[in-house]
Amino acid sequence: MCIRDSLHTAPAAASVPAKPVPAGPDYLLVDGYNVIFAWDDLRKLADGNLDAARRRLMDILCNYAGYRRCVPILVFDAYKVRGGAREVEQYHNLYVVYTREAETADMYIERATHELAKEHRTRVVSSDGAEQIIVMGHGALRVSARAFEEEVRAVEKEIREFLGE
């Protein structure tokens, strides 16, 4: 071995133990209005009827979650509603959260992610840059609304192919 080879040998990489993959269900937290106003078809629907856009997103997430086998939590801001209490309803396999007065969807998602990501693989769908950084700090994976739309369309295509449509 020549001296030059020994001087230019890369140092061994430090071994950092990988975080174990959590057992149990995967969680998917979705910032509802962020997605509605990022997806063209939902935004157009919301221009005429916001409730219809919310229901359409709920149906989309039910199908997606059933196929991907994850626990979806869809969060809508209600922070401008005076005296509003947090409301959680179940719509098929989907949990829908309407935040309480003075609570944004981001605030709810940050708290939920902080708890869920300790024990479960957790993904957050939001195009809010600050939100993405915070949830990544809690150990969650982040997905932009646009990237999630592409993922949903791919799942819908797989479902149609499976059903032979």
Report the location of each language-model feature.
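Catalytic core of IPPT-family isopentenyl/dimethylallyl transferases
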Residues: 12-14
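Nuclease catalytic cores that cleave nucleic-acid phosphodiester bonds
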Residues: 4-7, 16-30, 34-165
